Amino acid sequence: AAECLAGLVMHQAQRPGAPFIFGACGSPMDMRTMLFPYGSPDWRLNDLAMAEMARSYGLPVFGTGGTTDSKLLDAQAGMEFANSLLIAAMAGTNLIHDVGYLDTGLTGSLESLVLGAEQIRWVKKFIAGLDVSEETLALDVIRAVGPARHFMAQGHTRRHLRKTLWQPYAL
């Protein structure tokens, strides 16, 4: 964080008012491997702290997501991709980068980008929340159908069925 603040000061001294995106990547280094573990909660906590600092300064923030320590696209990769993307999005990160990085950022693959893109779609749906409106509640349709019939034949159901339930593209 100190390096980012120093960069901000130098940047603004050179060009007052110039755009600046706040953020820094990092966590405690794993001294066994001499690598920074992308998948660790420590990395995510750092991203959360940077997002909070950026918000207090009124600046946009970047962070990482869709990253893993795993060398393969396996269960660990899926869990770490999902955790990191969801945490970054919920923190309000404006620019999420490194999507698709494997093996603590040492490798990447097109397959991991596809998985990352799919999980980004999932996170966007989750962050958007529920659409609660007169149209989506459809109380008039509920009253019209009544307790003993079904909703499958209703135009409202047909209009909303495919866009309400998230569907994966690649998985």
Predicted regions and their residues:
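Glycine-rich anion/phosphate-binding loop at the beta-strand->alpha-helix junction
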Residues: 1-116
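Catalytic-core signal marking the mid-to-C-terminal active-site face
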Residues: 111-171
